[in-house]
């Protein structure tokens, strides 16, 4: 059934709305000059099917990994730290310990997979929340496209796909363009497409402020949150609205799928053809993929594929009611968002009034002051349905999850139901990842979910795991520089590379790889592992930025490739690669002259090559 498309009747004096015209035809293919035009027919891979036997094997391998890891670290601290060079020995052992903590947290948060059962799409308000017979009516939904400086024609594509969404019942579907850029061209696109257009006179609160303005001038029971480049699939509404039959469900998050990723060449084919190794190369490539999973050479040069994050991490948090909102591709219950905003508004006023009047001893005077101050505070404070924060999506999730009275639930729907564009250059990628890291760390410092009442143990653990991941430089930096220190000085952080060392580290590493392979079965994680290490410099800058008390500003992620030389973004990576190469040469000469032992060199060589493979992908991306 085609949706009824309209716009909000109400508008504040500071806002502008454009009345809709007759809707145009359903979505058309993009213009040929769009870089993503050749990818229009791509379809997302389905979510990995649940398999109880594979989950049991993963859990068994994870337990073995944790036992072997604990055994290895106990041996490292008691028997193999190079105390004679403690300034390298202790930092490495500490880095290994911190990395192992991350492994423990990963296994705990991905321990099991329990998808929420789907229900039939509701038709009326009373099916998702309390409504008297007199107040009952067909369900209404607002589809929101916040935009600032994106090409209006790009937004048109998204709007047209939204207009093509279907639903099995006659409900009211309102599509709105939320233009924080106040552009005549964007206004005209909205008019031509027959959808609502909302703007405002200021950009306070950035995207969150834009969303707040939209909520003030719309009235849908459910809110579909999109980005300017979000292209909803026709089935998005009918596949997600059924979850809201559970009146505790505050929001549903669907995976973000980037349909413009470079698919690369499968490793066996690349070895056989590009390196001209023929059948032998193909055989070697297949053997490597059996251990590490599918590898496509040149695929996704910026590590943008979010499947690991959504199909493994977010999906496995579902059972604990701990998957969080990620903005685009999410559907919110208006009642939940507005109710939490009202509670926060009341709390702010209560705190301010108490601070100004609690010291007044006269009961009558105190009551008069509270009334007067309360009225003034009510005028001074604003209702903020979405937190004015660079990471408003996860912040809003934390607030909703921690409501001890309503006990709001979240649902992660594992099936991609929209498509989006990914960063096409390293500058855009860096802006986006800095925002993710800085926003999460800022929340950790100023409103840490671990200290927030109302969250369950598992919710705190899983939010804490997300925060912990952004402290990764504490262990990735030592792991990057230790081989280089050895190559130049001959000083090893491990006291001896003997049979005891191999006997402890090899079983742990092999079992860890097996557990990770089983836990991420069917998901390409290789590139993500590399970028986790290569991300160190942006991560350091975000961490220092937040620790210095600087605000993390909201920057719109560019939707087209930015031109320029981005070598300045990877100078630390280049420096580490050069030092690694020079260091290997120096130590190799010493080995040839018999001045150094071979064992430490071999271990550090393989270690350094792994580091170099991760660092080099970001260097190549800078010049792509």
What are these regions (language model features)?
Residues 98, 102-450:
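Internal catalytic domains of large membrane-associated glycosyltransferases
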Residues 2-135, 190-194, 290-291, 472-476, ...:
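N-terminal membrane-anchoring/stem segments of glycan-assembly enzymes
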Residues 29-46, 408-424, 443-453, 476-480, ...:
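Hydrophobic alpha-helical transmembrane segments
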Residues 116-130, 148-149, 161, 230, ...:
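Alpha-helical membrane-embedding segments
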Residues 43-62, 144-155, 452-476, 550, ...:
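Loop-to-transmembrane boundary segments
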Residues 68-97, 469-553, 566-624:
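Membrane-embedded multi-pass helical conduit in multi-pass membrane proteins
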Residues 1-44, 421-423, 501-541, 545:
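Membrane-anchoring/interfacial helices and their immediately flanking loops
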Residues 439-460, 539-542, 619:
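C-terminal, non-catalytic tails of nucleotide-sugar-dependent glycosyltransferases
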């Amino acid at each position: 059934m085609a949706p009824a498309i309209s716009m909000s009747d109400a508008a504040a004096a500071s806002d502008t709305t454009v009345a809709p015209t007759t809707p145009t035809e359903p979505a058309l293919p993009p213009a040929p000059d769009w870089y993503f035009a050749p990818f229009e027919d791509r379809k997302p891979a389905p979510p990995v099917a649940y398999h109880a036997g594979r989950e049991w094997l993963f859990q068994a391998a994870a337990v073995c990994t944790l036992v072997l890891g604990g055994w290895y670290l106990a041996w490292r601290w008691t028997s193999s730290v190079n105390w004679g060079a403690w300034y390298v020995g202790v930092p490495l052992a500490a880095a290994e310990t911190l990395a192992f903590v991350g492994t423990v947290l990963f296994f705990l948060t991905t321990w099991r997979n329990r998808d929420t059962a789907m229900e039939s799409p509701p038709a009326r308000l009373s099916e998702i929340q309390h409504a008297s017979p007199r107040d009952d009516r067909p369900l209404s939904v607002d589809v929101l496209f916040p935009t600032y400086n994106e090409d209006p024609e790009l937004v048109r594509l998204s709007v047209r796909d939204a207009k093509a969404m279907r639903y099995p019942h006659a409900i009211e579907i309102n599509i709105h363009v939320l233009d924080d850029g106040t552009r005549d061209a964007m206004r005209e696109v909205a008019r031509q497409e027959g959808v609502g257009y909302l703007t405002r006179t200021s950009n306070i609160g950035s995207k969150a402020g834009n969303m707040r303005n939209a909520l003030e001038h719309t009235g849908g029971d459910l809110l579909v949150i999109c980005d300017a480049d979000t292209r909803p699939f026709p089935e998005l509404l009918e596949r997600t609205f059924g979850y809201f039959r559970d009146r505790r469900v505050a929001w549903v998050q669907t995976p973000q799928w980037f349909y413009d990723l470079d698919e690369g060449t499968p490793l066996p084919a690349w070895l056989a053809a590009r390196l001209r190794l023929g059948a032998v190369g193909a055989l070697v490539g297949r053997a490597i993929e059996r251990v590490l999973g599918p590898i496509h050479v040149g695929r996704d040069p910026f590590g943008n594929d979010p499947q690991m994050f959504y199909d493994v991490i977010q999906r496995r948090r579902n059972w604990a009611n701990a998957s969080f909102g990620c903005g685009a591709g999410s559907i919110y219950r208006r009642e939940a968002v507005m109710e939490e905003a009202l509670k926060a508004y009341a709390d702010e006023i209560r705190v301010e009034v108490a601070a100004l009047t609690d010291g007044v001893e006269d009961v009558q005077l105190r009551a008069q002051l509270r009334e007067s101050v309360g009225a003034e505070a009510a005028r001074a404070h604003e209702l903020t349905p979405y937190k004015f924060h660079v990471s408003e999506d996860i912040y809003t999730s934390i607030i909703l999850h921690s409501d001890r009275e309503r006990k709001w639930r979240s649902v992660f729907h594992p099936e991609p139901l929209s498509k989006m564009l990914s960063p096409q250059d390293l500058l855009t990628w860096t802006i986006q990842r800095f925002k993710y890291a800085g926003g999460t760390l800022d929340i950790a410092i100023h409103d840490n979910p671990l200290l927030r009442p109302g969250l369950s143990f598992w919710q705190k653990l899983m939010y804490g795991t997300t925060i912990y991941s952004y402290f990764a430089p504490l262990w990735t930096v030592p792991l990057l520089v230790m081989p280089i220190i050895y190559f130049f000085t001959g000083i090893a952080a491990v006291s001896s590379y003997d049979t005891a060392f191999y006997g402890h580290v090899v079983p742990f590493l092999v079992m860890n790889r097996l557990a990770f392979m089983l836990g991420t079965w069917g998901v390409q994680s290789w590139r993500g592992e590399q970028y986790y290490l290569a991300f160190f410099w942006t991560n350091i800058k975000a961490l220092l930025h937040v620790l210095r008390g600087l605000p993390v500003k909201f920057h719109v992620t560019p939707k087209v490739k930015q031109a320029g030389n981005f070598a300045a973004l990877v100078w630390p990576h280049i420096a580490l690669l050069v030092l690694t190469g020079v260091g290997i040469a120096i130590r190799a000469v010493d080995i040839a002259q018999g001045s150094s032992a071979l064992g430490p060199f071999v271990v550090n060589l393989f270690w350094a090559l792994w580091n170099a493979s991760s660092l080099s992908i970001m260097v190549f991306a800078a010049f792509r």
